[in-house]
Amino acid sequence: MQFPDRLIQHFDSALRVMSGVSVAGRPNPAAKVADGDLDSAQRRHSAGLMRVNHVGEVCAQALYQAQAQFARSPAIRQQLLLAGREEEDHLAWTAERLRELGSRPSLLNPLWYAGAFALGTVAATLGDARSLGFVVETERQVEAHLNQHLSSLPPQDAKSLAIVKQMSTDEAEHGAAAHALGAQTVPPLAQMGMQAMAKVMTSTAYYL
């Protein structure tokens, strides 16, 4: 696919993400799970966590699109696009769960998307190995915060738990795939910067 075609594909993806019309390619893992009895505080907490997870998937779409756009290797570009497609499943699942909880996505999604796309572009310009290293570190941090959510979500919120469990499994697989393609380890200082930015995003998106 030529660069102009990839650019058009990116704009199409961005519009779908921003408009909330993403469609999952796989069944929702919570589709056949009974909804638990949540009180108002538990419902608000679950919604806050799932909003954070939805923002994470908005950022994932931007990151993978940017990195795929500027990847040098066709094989690496295809892997990034494949991972991005699976992340779009997560986007659809978390959006659906937010609706079920009577809540909404983050009001700052355009800002999160733009920032993540810029970050992905910078990572891609450093070369494929470093870009893949960025994927590995991103997925490691995302998997860690998803596992924290598994402990923080109300035990009776079986639907959210089912979604987060599948997301965690997928993130680990994406990180392993990037590592197998020759990822270069992200320097410790960059890892700390990524963690700091993620903390700002998660603490803000929980409410907004």
Curated annotation (Swiss-Prot):
Top class in the EC scheme: oxidoreductase
Record organism: Janthinobacterium sp. (strain Marseille) (Minibacterium massiliensis)
Record-level GO BP terms: ubiquinone biosynthetic process
Pathway membership, UniProt: Cofactor biosynthesis; ubiquinone biosynthesis
Annotated gene: coq7
Membrane topology: Peripheral membrane protein
Catalytic activity: a 5-methoxy-2-methyl-3-(all-trans-polyprenyl)benzene-1,4-diol + AH2 + O2 = a 3-demethylubiquinol + A + H2O
Official protein name in the record: 3-demethoxyubiquinol 3-hydroxylase
Cofactors, names only: Fe cation
Enzyme Commission numbers on file: 1.14.99.60
